[in-house]
Amino acid sequence: MSKEFLPTILEQKEQEVEAMSYEELQPLRSTYSLYEYLKSQSQELQLIAEVKKASPSLGDINLAVDIVEQARTYERCGAAMISVLTDEIFFKGHLDYLREISSQVSIPTLNKDFIIDEKQIVRARNAGATIILLIVAALSEKRLQELYDFATGLGLEVLVETHNLAELETAHRIGARIIGVNNRNLVTFETDINTSLQLSAHFKDDRVYVSESAIFSKEDAEQVAPYFHAILVGTALMQAEDVAEKIKELKIDKG
């Protein structure tokens, strides 16, 4: 695979969407609002726990995992939400994983994928997602706004992912309430936790912010805790020998 990860992935997504049929809308799964929950739990750094079998940068992470049991452990140990990778080609995920997990937990679930079309959003909702991911770097601002409005119009929440100041300002302009700062550059897939620290100077009081990627330890979590409502962690949890203990380590009391 090319080192230009994002363009390669988006090219594949365009092919997938072209072959994708429109699904009839199914009822929205009932759970709490992630935005309201993160706002109300600001005294503790919250955890968005991810189910991820593989990635383009690391290759296979944990192919043997029981995805439902992993998700149940996340919920039992206090995760605010479960993120589920559904990309098949690059992350070895599947929409069925989202469907299975969403049917077995009561907390919000995020469809973690590269969404570029309304058809994907309907499929995500039908599979049990209550939140979808939109990546600023993957879309024009006009298209980002269209997909954001479409998703929220269906009762879904949206995690809008950014990586630099220009993208953060775009997320603010479209009215995003839940904003992620990805410490991973989606072109090179290199990570730097300083991305979160630098962008935190530009946050707005009425939004909630999630630091994503490059968080493996208590020390990493403590670095971002003063500025963020939550962290999104995948690899560290998927590789942990004791998932419950790892979650306990990453949940930081902000006083």
Swiss-Prot record:
Its EC number is: 4.1.1.48
Transmembrane ranges?
A: none
Q: Which SUPFAM superfamilies match?
A: Ribulose-phoshate binding barrel
Please give the pathway this protein is involved in.
Amino-acid biosynthesis; L-tryptophan biosynthesis; L-tryptophan from chorismate: step 4/5
Q: What class of enzyme is it?
A: lyase
Q: Which PROSITE patterns match?
A: IGPS
Q: Which InterPro entries does the record cross-reference, listed alphabetically? A: Aldolase_TIM, Indole-3-glycerol_P_synth, Indole-3-glycerol_P_synth_dom, Indole-3-GlycerolPSynthase_CS, RibuloseP-bd_barrel
Q: Which GO terms describe its molecular function?
A: indole-3-glycerol-phosphate synthase activity; phosphoribosylanthranilate isomerase activity
Which keywords does this Swiss-Prot/TrEMBL entry list? Amino-acid biosynthesis, Aromatic amino acid biosynthesis, Decarboxylase, Lyase, Tryptophan biosynthesis
Q: Which branch of life, at top level? A: Bacteria
BP terms from Gene Ontology = L-tryptophan biosynthetic process
| UniProt catalytic activity | 1-(2-carboxyphenylamino)-1-deoxy-D-ribulose 5-phosphate + H(+) = (1S,2R)-1-C-(indol-3-yl)glycerol 3-phosphate + CO2 + H2O
Cite a single Pfam family from the UniProt record: IGPS
Which HAMAP family has this protein been placed in?
A: IGPS_B
State the protein's name. Answer: Indole-3-glycerol phosphate synthase
Protein's organism: Streptococcus gordonii (strain Challis / ATCC 35105 / BCRC 15272 / CH1 / DL1 / V288)
Ranked from the top, the taxonomy reads: Bacteria, Bacillati, Bacillota, Bacilli, Lactobacillales
